[in-house]
Amino acid sequence: MANITAAMVKDLREKTGAGMMDCKSALNETAGDIEAAVDWLRKKGLAKAAKKAGRVAAEGLVAVESAGRHAAVVEVNSETDFVARNDSFQAFVREAAKVALNAEGGVEALEAAHFPGSQTTVKDRLQELIATIGENMTLRRTAKLTVEKGVIATYVHSQVSEGLGKIGVLVALESDGDVGFLSTLGRQIAMHVAATNPLALDATGIDQATIERESNILREKNAGKPDHVLAKIVESGLKSYYKEVTLLEQPFVHDTSKTVSQVLKEAEGKAGGPVKLAGFVRYALGEGIEKEEGPDFASEVAAAAKG
């Protein structure tokens, strides 16, 4: 039997909202596999679907930089929140986002890019910062959105300085319509994305493995029912799932009586033409990163006592 720790139970409770004893049972039944335990609880009807599992533990900052029809977002991680409040660190993250506007490619391309008017690359500057501050830092990821017509709207949540915060969102709206109106609408949708964390724009953007996983959970929860009934249950369940995790089908946070898709359709009159939500990017600081927890205070004292 796997060694089930209190930390594992706590982690599972945070992911699922299930009771402590149910979480312990799930971990015992799945030999301590957290993701399998999430599915076990859901099959038993003891947990809600987790759109994106994973503890968020890394420090650092997310930055966005916009230039009308194109915008970029970057995430730079540090070991401590203390460094994230450092002026030099914040300046680096902000400048890296500006460079990302014109860099083609992912992290490696951005690291190799030069700061404007300088022979120093982004990677070199980061190494200098590490040496100066004395803490490890990582340029973790970067993304960019561009439209030929329309706007790229941005939003930063938990902002610590202009364009810097814990969550950064880009939203691409393609339209020949009024730019001022599109910018306002785009920002509202970006705020929605920050709040709801959709998996994809629509159902076609969800990978097949995720769909199969949801289908299997629905089948096992309704095992024993006739095949034709089960097929309808799975179909209905997936439709509900898509409404929960796809941006266009989600209830709009600013007016939950409408979906985002309906809001876009109604916006065409004010915009003066069709409005298409072409894409979005949402970066949450530390998303999917697990940071090792240090020993508790009692353990530290015991270790020190041993010499």
UniProtKB/Swiss-Prot annotation:
Give UniProt keywords alphabetically. Answer: Cytoplasm, Elongation factor, Protein biosynthesis
Q: Where does this protein reside within or beyond the cell?
A: Cytoplasm
**GO MF annotation list:** translation elongation factor activity
Look up keyword 4Fe-4S and say if it applies.
Answer: no
Q: One Pfam match, by short name?
A: EF_TS
InterPro entries named among the record's database cross-references:
EF-Ts_dimer_sf (IPR036402), Transl_elong_EFTs/EF1B (IPR001816), Transl_elong_EFTs/EF1B_dimer (IPR014039), Transl_elong_Ts_CS (IPR018101), UBA-like_sf (IPR009060)
Give the matching PROSITE patterns.
EF_TS_1, EF_TS_2
Region annotated Involved in Mg(2+) ion dislocation from EF-Tu, chain positions: 80-83
Entry-linked CDD domains: UBA_EF-Ts (cd14275)
The family this protein is said to belong to: Belongs to the EF-Ts family.
What is this protein's function per UniProt? Associates with the EF-Tu.GDP complex and induces the exchange of GDP to GTP. It remains bound to the aminoacyl-tRNA.EF-Tu.GTP complex up to the GTP hydrolysis stage on the ribosome.
Name under which the protein is recorded: Elongation factor Ts
Q: Which organism is it from?
A: Methylobacterium nodulans (strain LMG 21967 / CNCM I-2342 / ORS 2060)
Protein's gene: tsf
